[in-house]
């Protein structure tokens, strides 16, 4: 199928997917209507409701496909605009950080890689699954990874505007005391042997900058990398 998203500049993934569905509504809804009408006939005469389920699966699958293509094209456009390379799928086994230790069926998609001021940078979408049956849930995140010189102890900065990362921290981590105005927005976890050094790093000025620029993002410093994660991928937009 032709990728119509390649013809437009995508600023908002959700809006572009919605526009695509509305502009090609016949592809989505005419098969649904046909399957639904056929399903009603089969239910009335044969008592089999399976075809009704198929009609709804068609719509859900079509919407998911359109959204996925919009997300891929957004990342391709972002990569071209910043001289990055669109890689596609990535290897979870190579990743460091507490986020990548939880759940099953882990996957990295729409990976792009590049460099800025000699620092390697990667952006990608990450997902994993927890639970089973009625309790099965897929967790989705947008992730940025930046490499820097030197090594850092494993420090986690948990944004209280996003998901609770405290349950993912290492057994040897300790939550550090910070001023109440900052504690309302963030929680900081560090190895017990690096408590003083970490508090010296996260000064009030640094925490103020985090509130201005990183509210809603979880951060992790591990070895020579900084990870920034956010679970609100449904609002993934291009920002200037």
Show which residues each predicted segment covers.
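Charged, low-complexity intrinsically disordered regions
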Residues: 3-27, 75-82, 88, 102-240
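Alpha-helical transmembrane spans
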Residues: 13-70
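Charged, compositionally biased non-catalytic regions
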Residues: 54, 60, 65-91
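Generic, low-specificity signal for short hydrophobic/alpha-helical stretches with a mild N-terminal bias
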Residues: 57-61, 94, 170, 192
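Membrane-cytosol interface segments
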Residues: 93-96, 101-102
């Amino acid at each position: 199928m032709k990728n119509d998203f390649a013809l437009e500049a995508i600023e908002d993934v959700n809006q572009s997917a919605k526009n695509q569905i509305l502009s090609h509504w016949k592809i989505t809804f005419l098969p649904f209507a046909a399957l639904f009408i056929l399903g009603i006939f089969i239910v009335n005469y044969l008592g089999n409701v399976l075809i009704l389920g198929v009609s709804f699966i068609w719509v859900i699958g079509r919407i998911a496909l359109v959204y996925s293509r919009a997300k891929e094209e957004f990342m391709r456009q972002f990569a071209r605009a910043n001289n990055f390379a669109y890689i596609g799928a990535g290897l979870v086994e190579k990743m460091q950080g507490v986020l990548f230790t939880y759940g099953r069926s882990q996957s990295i998609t729409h990976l792009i890689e590049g460099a800025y001021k000699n620092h390697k940078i990667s952006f990608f979408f990450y997902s994993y699954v927890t639970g089973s049956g009625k309790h099965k849930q897929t967790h989705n995140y947008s992730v940025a990874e930046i490499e820097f010189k030197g090594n850092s102890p494993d420090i986690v900065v948990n944004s209280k505007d996003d998901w609770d990362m405290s349950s993912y921290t290492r057994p040897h981590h300790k939550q550090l005391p910070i001023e109440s105005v900052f504690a309302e927005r963030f929680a900081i976890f560090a190895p017990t042997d690096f408590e003083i050094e970490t508090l010296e790093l996260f000064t009030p000025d640094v925490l103020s900058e985090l509130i201005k620029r990183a509210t809603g993002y979880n951060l992790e410093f591990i070895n020579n990398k900084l990870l920034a994660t956010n679970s609100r991928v449904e609002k993934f937009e291009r920002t200037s």
